[in-house]
Amino acid sequence: MAEKRNIFLVGPMGAGKSTIGRQLAQQLNMDFIDSDAVIEERTGADISWIFDLEGEDGFRKREERIINELTQMQGIVLSTGGGAVLSKENRNYLSARGIVIYLETTVEKQFQRTQRDKKRPLLQDAENPRQVLEDLAKIRNPLYEEIADITLPTDEQNAKVMVNQIVDLIDNMNGLNGAL
């Protein structure tokens, strides 16, 4: 059997990276890691608190160190934070060390999925969260596209269907009869 390759999920908040990532890892018998959860675990603080204390720049520096470390592991499905692609280094780590899957979603669907979530520091104090999401999409979507090996829209599919599509696409990419 071939050596397992890493799978990295990128995309905006609310695209389904964590939900799909957990199920994908389970189906492929790989470890699931959420980079934001690792940051919270290591700092003992949630992302919102880190943003409040250190600002976005401080958080992004932490995130870059964690993504560098995690992408060097083998056989993982990694869900990244929505802004991880802002760092050129992160984009390089992700694209060089595994298969990058961009889970694409519309701003409208993002808004629906995130409007009651209080753990979204960039939306917490926003007067117009939908406008914030639109502004983020303009900056980040081209960066997701730049590094994506596979792009999948998540608006109309449930997680199980998405996982099966991803497995099929990876199998086709590898030509290894299901071995990653």
UniProtKB/Swiss-Prot annotation:
Could you tell me what this protein is called?
Shikimate kinase
Q: Which PANTHER family match?
A: SHIKIMATE KINASE (PTHR21087), SHIKIMATE KINASE 1, CHLOROPLASTIC (PTHR21087:SF16)
- List, alphabetically, the NCBIfam families matched: PRK05057.1
Q: What does this protein do?
A: Catalyzes the specific phosphorylation of the 3-hydroxyl group of shikimic acid using ATP as a cosubstrate.
Cofactor binding comment, as recorded: Binds 1 Mg(2+) ion per subunit.
Q: Which InterPro entries match?
A: P-loop_NTPase, Shikimate/glucono_kinase, Shikimate_kinase/TSH1, Shikimate_kinase_CS
For the ligand (substrate), the binding residues are: 36, 60, 82, 140
Location in the cell reads: Cytoplasm
**Which keywords does the record carry?**
Amino-acid biosynthesis, Aromatic amino acid biosynthesis, ATP-binding, Cytoplasm, Kinase, Magnesium, Metal-binding, Nucleotide-binding, Transferase
One GO cellular component term noted in the UniProt record for this chain: cytosol
Q: Which GO terms describe its molecular function?
A: ATP binding; magnesium ion binding; shikimate kinase activity
Which annotated residues bind Mg(2+)?
18
Family, per entry: Belongs to the shikimate kinase family.
Task: Quote the Pfam families the UniProt record gives.
Answer: SKI
Q: Which reaction does it catalyse?
A: shikimate + ATP = 3-phosphoshikimate + ADP + H(+)
Assembly and interaction partners: Monomer.
Which positions in this protein are listed as binding ATP?
Answer: 14-19, 120, 157
Give the required cofactors: Mg(2+)
Q: Biological process GO annotation list?
A: amino acid biosynthetic process; aromatic amino acid family biosynthetic process; chorismate biosynthetic process
